[in-house]
C-alpha cells in the first residue's frame, strides 16, 4: 500500500481487532478484510478473471483476490515497494510507480490483454494538510480510473480508495460516465478515524464505436 496511515488527531493503533484477526488467519494485512467484503457484496471477481491490484503491498488484497480468481485466473499486483513473492504461479508482482511515464509500457509487458477488474488501494504519503492529501489521493485514483478505461474489458469492474473531499463528487461522476453503477462503500475494517472510502464501479460500459466519415 502506498504511503502511510493518515493522522486524524487520534493515536494510531495497528494492533486492533482486524490486525489480530489477520494475523490469526495468516493474512498479510488487515486490509484483506476490506477487499473480501467488497467482492462478497458485489459480483466483481470470479474464477478465471484477470485482476490488476494497484498499491498491492504487503499483499493482503492479493491473497483474497488469488482465492477468488483461482488457478485459471491471474492477479497482477504492483506497488512502489517490493511485495513478498507468492507461491501461486498465477499471482505476479512488480515494483512499479503508476505515476511514472513508463508505467503503461511496463504494465503491458506484464499483461497485454484486458482486465476483468482494476482494484486500487493506493494512498499517498500524508502531509497532514487535508486539501493536499485529498488532491494526492484523487491523483492516484484518477490514474487507476485511466487504466480501467483503457484496459478494462466491457462489463469489468473498478475499485479505488479515495479520501473524501471537495472534488469527490466530480470524481464519482467520472466513474459514472464509464460504469453502469457506482457505489460508495466504507468497509467495516476501515479504522474509525480514517477519511477513506472506496468507490466501486460496476459493469464497464462498452466503448462507443467511432462514427463513420
UniProtKB/Swiss-Prot annotation:
It is an enzyme of class 2 (transferase). Belongs to the class I-like SAM-binding methyltransferase superfamily. RNA methyltransferase RlmE family. PANTHER family: PRE-RRNA 2'-O-RIBOSE RNA METHYLTRANSFERASE FTSJ3, RIBOSOMAL RNA METHYLTRANSFERASE. HAMAP family: RNA_methyltr_E. The keyword tRNA processing does not apply. The keyword Transferase applies. It comes from Myxococcus xanthus (strain DK1622). S-adenosyl-L-methionine binds at residues 59, 61, 79, 97, 121. It comes from the Bacteria. The active site is at 161 (proton acceptor). Its EC number is 2.1.1.166. This is Ribosomal RNA large subunit methyltransferase E. It is found in: Cytoplasm. Specifically methylates the uridine in position 2552 of 23S rRNA at the 2'-O position of the ribose in the fully assembled 50S ribosomal subunit. InterPro entries: RNA_methyltr_RlmE, RNA_MeTrfase_FtsJ_dom, rRNA-MeTfrase_E, SAM-dependent_MTases_sf. One of its GO terms (cellular component) is cytoplasm. It catalyses: uridine(2552) in 23S rRNA + S-adenosyl-L-methionine = 2'-O-methyluridine(2552) in 23S rRNA + S-adenosyl-L-homocysteine + H(+). Keywords: Cytoplasm, Methyltransferase, rRNA processing, S-adenosyl-L-methionine, Transferase.
